[in-house]
Structures are given as C-alpha cells and as structure tokens.
Design a protein with these regions (language model features):
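Alpha4 helix (beta4-alpha4-beta5 surface) of REC/receiver domains from two-component response regulators
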Residues: 71, 92-109, 113, 117-120
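Active-site residues of response regulator receiver
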Residues: 61, 89
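Conserved sequence signature across two-component system core domains
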Residues: 9-10, 40, 58
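Two-component/phosphorelay signaling modules centered on CheY-like receiver
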Residues: 13-38
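Acidic catalytic/metal-coordinating carboxylates
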Residues: 42-45, 68-71
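Receiver (REC) domain active-site loop signature in two-component systems and cognate sites
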Residues: 64
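Non-catalytic signal-transmission and effector/linker regions of two-component phosphorelay proteins
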Residues: 1-5, 30-33, 116-127
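Active-site beta3 strand of CheY-like receiver
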Residues: 52-59
Length: 127
C-alpha cells in the first residue's frame, strides 16, 4: 500500500477535522495509506512546520489570515520543491486557478468536490 504523508493547512478548524477523519478512510478504499502528519491554521504555521513534518502533499487553503496560501506555496516550493501542493478553495474561477498555478500549486480542488477527486490528486504524487 502506498503511503502519502499529508499536511493540512486551513484556517477553519472544522475543515481540518473533517479532512483528518475522512482522508485516511477514503485513501484506504483507494489502496493508499494516507497519514496526516500535521495541521496548520495559516500559511505561516505551515512554513514553520514543513521541515520537521516532511509531508509528501500539502493541502492548502488559499484564503487565510496571517499568511494566505499563495505566499505560503511560493515559500514552501522554495524550501521543499518536491512537496506537492494541492489548493483547496471555495473559489473555482479561472483567475484564482491561474494565480494559484503561478504561485506553484500543483493541483486545484474546489471545496465540496467528491472526496475521490482529492484522493486522485494526492495519488499523482506517487505515480
């Protein structure tokens, strides 16, 4: 079974909690072992934790206080170019997608999409 280490970055505690609960179960059903190695409530916290946690995948909200996902992604990609950053956002318009891509986001999932979409995006890390 493929192991994927995940850092969840979102300012909403409920979103982090839901992902922490659902991802390992959905991953297991897809033949993946998803390990939630940590959480952060904003981009600055994520950057502070990235070296110690060494995730394969960072699930990144784009709009957060203190430091948003765009700037956090740019900094994460500088220090950890092999980390796969997947944006999780309520904004699915093309302008947001382009801005995320320019920041270094590897994949883009609109919140509320089927969990399988997120699992597939995470599985790309290990292909």
């Amino acid at each position: 079974m493929t192991n994927i280490r995940v850092l969840i970055v979102d300012d909403m505690a409920q979103v982090r909690s839901d992902l922490r609960t659902v991802l390992p179960l959905a991953g297991q059903a897809a033949g993946l072992q998803i390990e939630i190695v940590g959480e952060a409530g904003n981009g600055q916290e994520a950057i502070q934790r990235i070296s110690a946690l060494q995730p394969d995948v960072v699930l990144m909200d784009l709009e957060m206080p203190v430091m948003g996902g765009y700037e956090a992604t740019r900094q994460i990609k500088t220090h950890c170019p092999d980390c796969r950053v997947i944006a999780l956002t309520i904004h699915g318009d093309e302008t947001v997608r382009q801005k995320a891509s320019q920041a270094g986001v590897d994949d883009f999932i609109v919140k509320g999409a089927p969990i399988n979409s997120l699992i597939q995006a995470m599985a790309k890390e290990k292909e």
